[in-house]
Amino acid sequence: FAGDNLDDELYVRWLQYGVFNPIFRPHAQEGVPSEPVFRSDKAKRLAKSAIAMRYRMLPYNYNLMYQNHAFGKPLMRPLFFEEPNNTDILDYSKAYLWGNDILVSPVLEAEKRAQDIYFPKANVWFDFYTNEKIIGGQTKTVRLNENSIPTYVRAGAFIPLTKPISNTSEYDNSTLELHYYFDTSSPETVRTFYTDNGKDVNSIKNGDYEMMNFIAEYKGSNLKLNLKQIYVLRYTDENTLFPKDKAVDLRVHNIQNAPKSVKVDGKKVNVKWNSETKTLHIPIGWKASETKEIKIKLKR
């Protein structure tokens, strides 16, 4: 943003795009201030929402950095990674994958009300904000709203979020909001997430890190989820950032009816099912090195 470019809408769109970008910051030159505080009240409100979401994405984004470091996987991935034989999308630039499981389509024009997005085939996608289900292998015109840019999650994905925080030092890994996007098209899923104390550059070398393994299996009307800590860091005084116990707010999306029953480690538990969002909320206490098994009996 330079010269007389004071477009608040595009400023906000830039920050919304930055949520799913390796670098999150506003840019400006000459006499244009880059900070949100110098924008309109509406722009400040929308900017605050985007900044808050960036912090909430910390568990997912931190794992992307690990995958990049350990395996060379890019954080931002072109859609032809999904369909390498589809020459029509070799230069497709209207959307990209943020990691393996999130599809993002930036909004680049002001006053735009809709845009066409290609959804990779052989997948089902869910709107990150509304839970709308979209079948892959098609180009779909989606309506835009000012609160966010089009963002979608792959069916079968686990997306870990942290509680609302205002800076990275507040992230302590003691609470986790874990979203699982259920769909019969993806009956088996395995995802692994890396985390450490966020300070020591030698965490992997020193063995001071944690690998969380999330597994989903669906058969008949039975959905089983396992949460495993396949490697737990050494809990020393220096690693107080990582409590041994976690409070997990498990949210299972695309559950069309209230389930017949939900069991955690063989015991029936009370859960909340939202009839509007079709989301099941399951609170779980998770101790270090402990495997949690969640069995959900669905209504057909």
Language model features with spans:
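Catalytic-domain carbohydrate-binding cleft regions of carbohydrate-active enzymes
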Residues: 1-149, 153-154, 195-198
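Short, surface-exposed charged micro-motifs
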Residues: 94-95, 116, 213-215, 270-272
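Preference for bulky hydrophobic residues occupying beta-strand positions
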Residues: 106, 117, 250-252, 282, ...
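Solvent-exposed beta-strand/loop surfaces of large extracellular or lumenal domains
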Residues: 127-146, 261-283
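Extracellular interaction modules
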Residues: 144-146, 286-294
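Accessory, solvent-exposed terminal regions and/or long lumenal/extracellular loops of proteins
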Residues: 153-260, 264-267, 274-277, 283-290, ...
